[in-house]
Amino acid sequence: MASSQPPLPPPPPPLLLLALLLLLKVSDTSSSVSTATSTASETDNLTSKPLTSSFSSSSPTVWEKQTSQEKPETASTSHPDSSSSESTISHSPSNSGTTSTTQPTSSQPEPDTHPSSGSPSSEHTVTSPSLGSVSLATLPWSPTHPKPSTGPPSVSLATTDRTFETSGYAPGDSGVPRLHRNPGVVVAVCLLVSALLIGGAIMAVRRCHNGVSEFQKLDEGLVSRRSSSAHHTLP
């Protein structure tokens, strides 16, 4: 009797083999990417810690230097906001120059309204930044008056004096330049005007006398002619 052998199983198709190989490769790449991201996050944490610590340690010294250089002033401003958050700045006049600031928590710019001194209805609005900046103080000017200069007062006074000297306008004048009068020139002009007036009067008198003399001559001639004609008619 011939020995019966079991039939051999059919070989797996090549498509299944390719699918298995692709799955293995994808799993390897995903594991490598996850390890790379974890190492990158660790390095970021390590580098960010010393930076934040150094910034926090250096910021108080800079703030102290700025406050020590500033002059002691007293000013306070309040800005209304929709979320009822306030921003105040107070400078206490002390030798140490300590200041306390409270910044608003909203991220939108806050309007600062200031009524003008000239008209009660007109308002001057100024938008101040929300975070990381100091809010503006109360503006002392109105739309009808010019904006005050931000430079030192000595420089502004010098510039105004120079402008008055170059343009010839005085601070109280209404726009008419001053004329520097020389007394000698004024006297000469007065003498010329008086001489012209006197000469004109003399010429007018002479012309009047000339006219009268001519009329007299004509009258005398007519009288002599009449007398001569009368003498001729008498004999």
From Swiss-Prot:
Main subcellular localisation: membrane
UniProt keyword list: Glycoprotein, Membrane, Signal, Transmembrane, Transmembrane helix
Tissue: Highly expressed in large intestine, small intestine, rumen, and kidney tissues.
GO CC term (a single one): membrane
Membrane topology: Single-pass type I membrane protein
Localization, UniProt: Membrane
Glycosylation sites: 45
Signal sequence, start to end: 1-31
UniProt feature, compositional bias: Low complexity: 28-61, 76-110
Region (Disordered) location: 28-159
Biased composition (Polar residues): 114-136
Cystines in this chain: none
Extracellular compartment residues: 32-184
Residue ranges annotated as Cytoplasmic topological domain: 206-235
Record field: transmembrane: 185-205
Protein name, UniProt field: Protein CIST1
Organism encoding this protein: Bos taurus
Lineage of the species this protein comes from: Eukaryota, Metazoa, Chordata, Craniata, Vertebrata
